[in-house]
């Protein structure tokens, strides 16, 4: 989907900071747990991440200064199965892990939310996703007993017992030519299918907007696909027009 049906030009459309969360920590999480680099030619990196840096700068932040002040000691890189990324820093004397990723994954690892707060956050995610926005969640964790240097070693267990910070919603507009391309495929008897790592609600909104999903069509997530037998998948194949939250192995199975 990204860059083929959409422009791959992400922009931050909205933010939500948990009222009890320090605003500066939310901002730091968005730009420190981030692999964007800045050159004379502009931003280099994944558009989802460069949009966070652009927003931070637009809001008055100094990206180079903040990266120099709070260097990254260690990281747990993003992968499509875990759907999280974490980085480790010394924030004014405090050893802090920042984590960003998919809300549905990150929310289950947080410990500082009431049931009402969880419901409100999930409702906001539903609202943004239904508008075709990509939602990123951010959290932090104070770490005890880990050396504050590049000799620090992180493992996946650190991505538990997190403190939720907030959400950012990004828009990746559809390419103008996508609408006609999808229509032309249908006129030629070709059934277009969208395959994406995005949340199912977000992807469905975009798929409907550009004409890929029609009445009666089905959207399936990667985990749902994993639970399907081959016969079950073949039986639903003609109705499935969207595969969301897919992993690389899911994509191989779909193509086969």
Model-found features: residue ranges?
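Conserved cytosolic headpiece of P-type ATPases
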Residues: 1-256
């Amino acid at each position: 989907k990204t860059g083929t049906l959409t422009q791959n030009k992400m922009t931050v459309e909205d933010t939500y900071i948990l009222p009890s969360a320090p605003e500066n920590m939310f901002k730091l999480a968005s730009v420190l747990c981030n692999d964007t680099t800045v050159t004379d030619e502009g931003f280099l990196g994944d558009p989802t991440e460069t949009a966070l840096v652009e927003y931070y700068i637009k809001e008055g932040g100094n990206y180079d200064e903040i990266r120099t002040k709070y260097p990254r000691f260690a990281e747990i890189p993003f992968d499509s199965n875990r759907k999280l990324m974490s980085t480790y820093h010394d924030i004014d004397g405090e050893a802090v892990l920042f984590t960003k990723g998919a809300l549905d994954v990150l929310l289950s690892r947080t410990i500082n939310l009431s049931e009402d707060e969880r419901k409100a956050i999930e409702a906001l995610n539903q609202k943004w996703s239904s508008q075709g926005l990509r939602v990123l969640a951010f959290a932090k964790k104070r770490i005890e007993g880990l050396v504050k240097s590049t000799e620090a070693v992180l493992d996946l267990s650190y991505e538990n017992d997190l403190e939720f910070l907030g959400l950012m919603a990004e828009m990746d507009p559809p390419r103008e030519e996508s609408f006609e391309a999808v229509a032309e495929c249908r006129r030629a008897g070709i059934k277009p299918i969208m395959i994406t790592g995005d949340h199912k609600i977000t992807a469905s909104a975009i798929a409907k907007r550009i004409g890929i999903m029609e009445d009666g069509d089905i959207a399936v997530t990667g985990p749902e696909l994993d639970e399907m037998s081959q016969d079950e998948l073949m039986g639903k194949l003609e109705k499935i027009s969207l595969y969301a939250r897919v992993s690389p192995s899911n994509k191989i199975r779909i193509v086969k």
